[in-house]
């Protein structure tokens, strides 16, 4: 049985822990905690072993938390570590633990792909380059926005690539996650140099892509507005929707009033953590004018990358084919069932 450790217990770490407990081929060693707070007891109550920095073990135990050992102890036992630590700490963990201990590691989208702080030489998107991660020891899982763009752009290129001249995408990003204690300010902010464009072109280099990013005062998902320029008349609306009909992790919805509607429906349908873990094309917003096609889709920021991280475990540890990995991922996350439920709830 393979041993996996989750280094962090925030938005991503807590969700991955839920998923991994369902996989009988994997033993979840435990999770890492860096701050003494109520989330520690939450993890213990769920049956997870908690590991903390060696220098903080006494402080945690003085608060009556049952600590199983140091983070280094857990990493030493592991076959693979999912680094779900605070953005920017991945390179520190790689230098301190993963590289010296020769451990495979999955990093999240906030870590650097290039430069002196690069943690890996590849950004993963299961729709595009799953096979290339099979022999890798270190991989970055693309961020929720980058993952969502890949799920839309790759099928379009495969079907209409010769006719597409350029992609322009405006990322309307949520300010904070639902569980976040971060203040949601009454402001709209812009990113002068969003990383999403370069990140996506890392695994789809042929895309003639231009990305702008805004941050809006909401906790309810991201919304992407994508404009495609064609060499001539674009395909019909029906043809575009047919392109995505059978795509894994892409739902086609109609008449949702906003991202909050979808999130609330996910909670109502009792999806784990209230996540859909997919992108949702809003068919009523699909527009064609002359040589231009406009697609709007919402992106589940909290759940999007969780199945993607799980896919990386299938490749890096279990060496499964993409088809086998998708089948196993659907078994754990019920992606097809969730897609069907959402499309039924938001239909014509």
Protein language model features and the residues they cover:
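A generic structural signal for alpha-helix starts
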Residues: 11, 147, 232-235, 304
């Amino acid at each position: 049985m393979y041993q996996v450790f989750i280094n962090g217990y925030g938005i991503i770490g807590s969700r991955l822990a839920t998923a991994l407990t369902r996989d009988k081929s994997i033993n979840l060693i435990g999770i890492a905690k860096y701050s003494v707070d109520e989330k520690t007891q939450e993890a213990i109550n769920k049956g997870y072993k908690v590991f903390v920095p060696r220098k903080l073990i006494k402080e945690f135990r003085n608060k009556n938390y049952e600590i199983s050992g140091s983070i280094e102890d857990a990493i030493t036992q592991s076959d693979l570590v999912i680094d779900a630590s605070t953005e920017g700490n991945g390179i520190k963990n790689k230098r301190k633990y993963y590289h010296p201990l020769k451990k495979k590691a999955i990093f999240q989208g906030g870590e650097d792909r290039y430069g002196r702080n690069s943690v890996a030489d590849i950004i993963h998107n299961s729709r595009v380059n799953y096979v290339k991660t099979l022999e890798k020891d270190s991989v970055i899982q693309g961020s929720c926005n980058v993952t969502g763009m890949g799920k839309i752009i790759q099928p379009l290129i495969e079907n209409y690539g010769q006719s597409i001249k350029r992609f322009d995408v405006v990322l309307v990003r949520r300010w904070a996650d639902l569980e976040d204690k971060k203040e949601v300010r009454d402001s709209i902010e812009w990113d002068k140099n969003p990383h999403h464009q370069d990140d996506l072109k890392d695994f789809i280099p042929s895309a003639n892509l231009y990305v702008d990013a805004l941050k809006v005062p909401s906790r309810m998902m991201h919304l992407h507005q994508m404009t495609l320029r064609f060499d001539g008349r674009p395909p019909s609306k029906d043809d575009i929707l047919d392109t995505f009909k059978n795509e894994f992790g892409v739902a086609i919805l109609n008449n949702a009033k906003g991202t909050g509607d979808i999130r609330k429906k996910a909670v109502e349908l009792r999806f784990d953590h209230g996540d859909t873990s997919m992108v949702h094309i809003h068919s009523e917003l699909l527009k064609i004018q002359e040589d231009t096609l406009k697609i709007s889709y919402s992106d589940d920021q909290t759940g999007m990358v969780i199945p993607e991280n799980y896919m990386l475990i299938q490749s890096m540890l279990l060496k499964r084919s993409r088809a086998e990995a998708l089948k196993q991922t659907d078994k754990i996350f019920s992606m097809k069932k969730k897609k069907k439920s959402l499309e039924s709830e938001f239909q014509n």
